[in-house]
Design a protein with these regions (language model features):
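General beta-strand structural signal in soluble alpha/beta enzymes
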Residues: 21-25, 41, 92-98, 122-124, ...
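Polyanion-binding loop/helix "lid" in catalytic or ligand-binding cores
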Residues: 62-73, 99-101, 111, 115, ...
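Active-site/ligand-binding-proximal alpha/beta "capping" segment
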Residues: 83-120
Length: 167
């Protein structure tokens, strides 16, 4: 799958006039503060996917090549989501999402390393879409559904079926 294919929906959303992007994913929980079934607002991310969707030819008048990523995820949208969840008696956690390429799950040693560098959750999506939306100047909120605990955190083996059932 190419970066262009992965970010196609962001291009389409921009062409349709969208100013905001709501991105969701299923992720493995690394942090001890997370449990299966939790929702986690992504405050920041770590891109270890081995690439960047802004590399290469991008033919769009609105795209910014060298874009600031200091606040890629909109704090105002995060505050609104937290307020709505509190008003409805639902807790949403916050944390740092780390993206890796799949399709294999991580090893316990990799998860220990990811925890050390500050990751709360890990997945195989979201970052390319967020980077492209940010390059278009869109406001972004991203939310992970913690579908499983990462390798070595839970004694249970990981499976795609578990991820599917819990999302």
């Amino acid at each position: 799958v190419t970066w262009k294919e992965i970010t196609h929906n962001i291009f389409l959303s921009k062409e349709m006039g969208c100013k905001n992007a709501i991105i969701t994913n299923a992720a493995g929980g690394i942090s001890e503060k997370l449990n299966v079934g939790d929702l986690m607002i992504i405050e920041d991310h770590i891109n270890l996917m081995g690439g960047n969707p802004l590399i290469g030819p991008l033919k769009h008048k609105d795209i910014q090549r060298f874009v600031d990523q200091t606040e890629i995820y909109c704090r105002k949208l995060q505050a609104t989501a937290l307020e709505i969840s509190r008003d409805n008696g639902f807790e949403i956690k916050k944390g740092v999402y780390l993206g890796l390429t799949g399709p294999a799950f991580e090893t316990p040693a990799e998860i220990r390393m990811l925890r050390t560098i500050g990751a709360d959750a890990v997945g195989m999506s979201t970052i390319p879409e967020a980077m492209m939306a940010n390059a278009f100047g869109m406001k972004i909120i991203a939310i992970s559904c913690i579908s499983n605990m990462a390798a070595g955190i839970s004694p249970n083996p990981l499976s795609h079926e578990e991820v599917s059932v819990n999302t």
